[in-house]
Structure formats: C-alpha cells, structure tokens
C-alpha cells in the first residue's frame, strides 16, 4: 500500500464490499480469503470513529457470531464459490486460533474445547481450514476437517453476494452486550502489555490480563499489534462517545448506567500499571519495568485520553522502538500528535537518526 493509487481498498470494512474486485485484480495470484477477527474489529472501529452512537462492548463479547462480525463472515463465505469472469473460484480459511495449549490440565482442556467448537462452527459455515498461532494447535484443530473427509469445500453452494443498504448496515451492526469494569481492566492490561512487548522486540507475545497472572486455569493467548490497537481503541470509544457501564462494580463503586469517564480511566490505568510493575519476571520482564513499560503506559494514556482518535497506533510504538527514556518518549509522542493534528502528517521515520 506504500504506492497505493486512488481507488485502492485500504481496509477490511471497505474490502467486504469489493471481494470480487480484489480477486479480479489479483487474478491467478489470489488463493482465498481469511476472516481475521482483530483486523475487522479495528477496521470498523476506525471507520465509525465519527459516529457517537457506535460503541463496542467488552472485547470478549465481540466473537465471530456477534453482530457485524457475523455479517462480515457471511459475506466472505458467499464469495467462496462465486466464480469470477474467468471461471476461477476461491476458498475461505477461518480466523486465527490464538490459544496456546500450555497451562493447567483443567485450563488446557477448557480452552481446547472452545477452540475445537470454534473450528467446528467455521467448518459447518463453509471454511476449508483455519490457521493457528502455535504449532501445538495443529493436531487439535486439524481433525475437525479430517473427519469430514474432504480436502476443501469447493463446490458447496452459498447464497449469492448482494449489495444492498441492508448488507451495508449489517457490516457495522451492534448488538446488546456487556460493557464492564472487568472488561476495561482486561483491555487496559493487555493493551499496555503488548506495547511493552513490542518495545522489547516482540511482534507477537503470549499475554493475559494481570489479574490472571499465576492462574494456570486461564491460558495465555498469542497476540500481535492489532491486539494493542483494538483494545485501546475500544477504551477510546467508551471514554469519548459516552459509553455507559452495564454492570455494577464493587471495587470502584461504579454503577449500571455510569459513564466511562476520564477519572475512572486514570484510576484503572494506575491500578493496572501497578499490577504489571509488581508482576513476576515470567509475566512482565523485570528489565522492562524501568525501560519500555513506562513508555507503553505513556502511549496508552495519550492514545485513550486524546480527543481525536489516532489512526495509527503502530506509529507511536515505532517512533519509540529502542527508546527507554520516558522523557524522550513524551517528547516524541507530542511531536507526533502535533504533526498529525496540525499538518495531517504521520511521522514514520526513525527518530534516532
């Protein structure tokens, strides 16, 4: 996309209305579709940043059967056996399985049961396979397709693609779901942890919320940059669009209907950050607690509190890569935010040179 021209499809939301056009442009180089979860959530959140009525729920509830995710997946599967003008077909590969089968016996069993159930659902919907974040998941999910006895689902009939206003509305459809303090803590904890992992040189990392450190019944999930971005993005929505809580919270005193306000965010940020600083080296590298972790916290705080949503979270990570100086990080973040707002310019170059 560095040399993109007008008309280029920039994101997943737009791509769902141009599935056949993408295939036509790539021609014989096109193999199939993949329904990524985080990427589509990010795409919708960015596209709907202007709409104050669009507020996501807890991220745990935005599954592939939730509202806009369900409709996104359905459009992709409809394109699977729709031939292009040259008679070529394409296959659909299900979303990424982030589970890692490492933990307590009970924790692994429960997580693997969910993973297999998810794979069975995708297979029944028309997926010809899925990809996994860890090689140990291959023998766990592969039998789902092996049991069917078919190499793929080419030839299976699906309803044809349509392009109606109802189709378009479905791609951003929200449905009632929880928005809670527990959900906010999970978003914040993992969001900061990913920023810290990136600063340590890891593009992908096994993470879970700090409140579950030491609990081997709760498994780590393999996460990448989309994780950090969407988690902070949802918190930004809650704060700046008037997201209201759906459950009481005894610890903070928050009640059903309370708005997710800046003071509440700052309190949760301080508490979750403190948990990470006190965590064992197994969960948060000790050598990061005075170097990259404070920088990750600063990025998260700036991203969520700023009135204007920052479109490129990755830029804030990149301009601070190899930087362990919090004061310098604050200068770079402010420089970036000023350039973005005043000049509509990104800073993508290495600021160390």
Predicted regions and their residues:
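Conserved alpha/beta-domain cores
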Residues: 1-353
């Amino acid at each position: 996309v560095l040399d993109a021209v007008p008309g280029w499809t920039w994101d997943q939301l737009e791509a769902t209305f141009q599935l056949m056009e993408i295939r036509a442009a790539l021609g014989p180089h096109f193999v199939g579709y993949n329904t990524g979860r985080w990427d589509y959530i990010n795409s919708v959140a960015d596209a709907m940043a202007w709409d104050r009525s669009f507020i996501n729920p807890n991220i745990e509830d935005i599954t592939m059967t939730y509202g806009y995710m369900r409709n996104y997946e359905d459009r992709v599967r409809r394109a699977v056996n729709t031939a292009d003008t040259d008679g070529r077909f394409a296959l659909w590969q299900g979303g990424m399985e982030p589970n890692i089968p490492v933990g307590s016996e009970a924790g692994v069993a429960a997580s693997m049961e969910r993973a297999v159930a998810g794979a069975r659902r995708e297979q029944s919907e028309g997926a010809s396979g899925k990809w996994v974040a860890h090689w140990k998941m291959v023998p766990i999910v592969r039998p789902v397709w092996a049991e069917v006895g078919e190499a793929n689902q080419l030839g299976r009939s699906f309803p044809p693609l349509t392009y109606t206003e109802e189709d378009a509305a479905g791609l951003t459809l929200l449905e009632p779901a929880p928005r809670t303090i527990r959900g906010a803590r999970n978003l914040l904890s993992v969001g900061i942890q990913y920023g810290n992992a990136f600063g340590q040189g890891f593009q992908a990392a096994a993470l879970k919320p700090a409140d579950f450190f030491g609990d081997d019944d709760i498994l780590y999930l393999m996460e990448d940059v989309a994780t950090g971005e969407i988690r902070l993005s949802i918190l930004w929505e809650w704060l700046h669009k008037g997201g209201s809580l759906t459950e009481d919270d005894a610890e903070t005193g928050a009640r059903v209907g309370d708005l997710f306000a800046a003071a509440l965010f700052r309190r949760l940020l301080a508490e979750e950050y403190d948990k990470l600083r006190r965590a064992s080296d197994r969960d948060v590298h000790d050598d990061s607690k005075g170097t990259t972790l404070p920088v990750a916290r600063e990025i998260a705080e700036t991203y969520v509190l700023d009135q204007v949503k920052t479109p490129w979270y990755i830029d804030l990570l990149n301009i601070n890569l190899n930087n362990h100086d919090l004061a310098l990080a604050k200068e770079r973040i402010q420089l970036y935010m000023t350039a973005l707002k005043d000049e509509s310019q990104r800073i993508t170059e290495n600021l160390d040179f």
